[in-house]
């Protein structure tokens, strides 16, 4: 089921999410809904607070397959990159954000089993961006420079 994506200004987006302790059918439905919502919105990542659920849950797909992160923690990061980012909760705006080039993340999967990922470049940015959402941080807080959207010429 496609869910409504909360937009910038909604106070839920500034709240800290709580850990997931129950790995059950409701969690699986939420993960499936989040993924469907993200794909429908043509995004590459979505955090549970963006659909109004203050739980530490993230879905990501940068065209390498679905990644589900429950209770994610960044365990290491190195390097740096300055790239353009957007957000499904701040439609129509993009900005340059500094992020690490490499990120290691540990989390749990939908069944509560431990998982680890190493993301670089775009995946590293996606990990950082979505985990920021779980802490009430929006990418607009980190924008170095806003980027003008190009007008569609028809």
Task: Identify the residue ranges that each predicted region occupies.
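Positively charged
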Residues: 1-154
